[in-house]
Design a protein with these regions (language model features):
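Histidine-rich, glycine-flanked metal-binding segment
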Residues: 1-56
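Short, acidic/polar
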Residues: 72-80, 131-140
Length: 211
């Protein structure tokens, strides 16, 4: 075990589903060990946070960092600092809302370049599935995107159009061959065409929502 250069002590440390008093040993910025609450080595700087909870960093897989192109909405600097302040140590950025979107290798590289030197935490990227980019899926996968996102209704931004069922099926086959994850904004407008309109007095009933 590496000797720690910092020890953080708490009465509530979360590890493998158990909450217990412990000391967290940190060496060169990396957690090196957990020991009993009273086992803080002498001469090592320590911080006692009382009963504040120490837990592994959270991962948020649905984040919209709109840089480049719409940084006034959110950029890597603000998004990752806010995440760190809330205990989130990894985010995965959605492929739309930036300009260009992450629907090909060029868009991904522009994202990576925009993130350079601005991230306070770890950042991963989703790729986008849009009409006409099926040949971009494999290169994006090989470049390291963690999966793909598509919309089945308009996304709200013109540069990230939705796919039809006819476009979705061959893309799903391609992604299956890659072992890649596909996320779908899962509304199918045509499936709702014959749904009877609810009576106004019923629309807020929870039982109706469940149906």
């Amino acid at each position: 075990m590496l000797p720690p250069d910092l020890v953080i002590r708490s009465t509530r440390v979360v590890c493998r589903g158990v909450v217990a008093p412990a000391c967290v040993h940190v060496s060169n910025g990396v957690i090196a060990a957990l020991t009993a609450h009273h086992e803080a080595p002498a001469g090592v700087p320590s911080v006692d946070v009382g009963n504040a909870v120490i837990l592994p960093g959270l991962v948020d897989t649905h984040v919209h960092v709109n840089e480049p192109g719409r940084t006034e909405w959110e950029g890597f600097q603000t998004a990752t600092r806010a995440a760190a302040a809330g205990g989130v140590t990894t985010i995965v950025d959605m492929p739309l809302n930036s300009i260009p979107p992450v629907t090909d290798g060029k868009g991904l590289q522009m994202k990576i370049d925009a993130a350079g030197g601005q991230c306070w935490i770890d950042v991963g990227f989703w790729g986008g599935l849009v009409p006409g980019n099926i040949l971009e899926l494999r290169p994006l996968h090989e470049q390291g995107v963690l999966g793909f996102k598509c919309f089945l209704i308009p996304s709200g931004v013109d540069e990230f159009p939705c796919v039809t069922e006819a476009e979705l099926r061959p893309a799903m086959a391609e992604l299956s061959s890659l072992g890649a994850v596909l996320l779908a904004h899962a509304e199918l407008p045509q499936a709702n065409k014959n749904v009877p309109k609810l009576q106004p007095s019923m629309e807020r009933q929870y039982s109706v929502y469940l149906q």
